[in-house]
Amino acid sequence: MSLQAIIEAAFERRAEITPKTVDAETRAAIEEVIEGLDSGKYRVAEKIDGEWVTHQWLKKAVLLSFRINDNQIIDGAETKYYDKVALKFADYTEERFAQEGFRVVPSATVRKGAYISKNCVLMPSYVNIGAYVGEGTMVDTWATVGSSRQIGKNVHLSGGVGIGGVLEPLQANPTIIGDNCFIGARSEVVEGVIVEDGCVISMGVFIGQSTRIYDRETGEIHYGRVPAGSVVVSGSLPSKCGKYSLYCAVIVKKVDAKTLGKVGINELLRTIEE
């Protein structure tokens, strides 16, 4: 069989593939693809006759590579830090990582006192002391979870997202992201704002305590809270005098958990009626 055919066939039975059960031919094919991607021999997408073409079989090989390898210690760049707070993983062994059940990509930094739940994935990101990251959550590249911030289960914090946090003043409430939320790239949620369960925040949305969160269906304006199931984009509202507009976050639709589970995030954001 061709390399592509081996990958396609393996992907159809991917649920059966583990590091212990994968056959030699399949492992070799997957590793050949990964090496090819690493060297530039293969590209997941390339321009052919002026059109971008995606090679889905290469993506399948990447997904399969997660099935055939166990987690292992990966040494990062050697450096030194000078701080009062230790790093969470400073004394972790391979057994400890395996027991706790999350993945940590090189350059991700977590300070001692932050909690990372099972099945989380930390891309090169920063999680500060006192933060809680719920089960199954992805903290994507350059995302920041501030001190004492609470992130729910099955959340995706996209690239460059900031969940702001400060330890003082003591009376300030932490920013909270509920379960099953998606926070789009480069968005910021700060100042103790609560994003309730099942919300989808588009990229580039900034929400603090003074941000008006406008529900276009009801005309209601929220402060400091995004209601459950909201799909939110950035927008603006006119001033009372009508001479200018000021930034706001706009709730463009509501979705329930069933819809959120069936419909892709991109589809929710692209099917917005103006």
UniProtKB/Swiss-Prot annotation:
Q: Does the keyword Kinase apply?
A: no
Q: Where in the cell is it found?
A: Cytoplasm
Q: In which pathway does it act?
A: Amino-acid biosynthesis; L-lysine biosynthesis via DAP pathway; LL-2,6-diaminopimelate from (S)-tetrahydrodipicolinate (succinylase route): step 1/3
Q: Which GO terms describe its molecular function?
A: 2,3,4,5-tetrahydropyridine-2,6-dicarboxylate N-succinyltransferase activity; nucleotidyltransferase activity
What does the record give as EC number? 2.3.1.117
Return the similarity comment.
Answer: Belongs to the transferase hexapeptide repeat family.
Name of the protein in question: 2,3,4,5-tetrahydropyridine-2,6-dicarboxylate N-succinyltransferase
Source organism of this protein record: Actinobacillus pleuropneumoniae (Haemophilus pleuropneumoniae)
Q: Which gene encodes it?
A: dapD
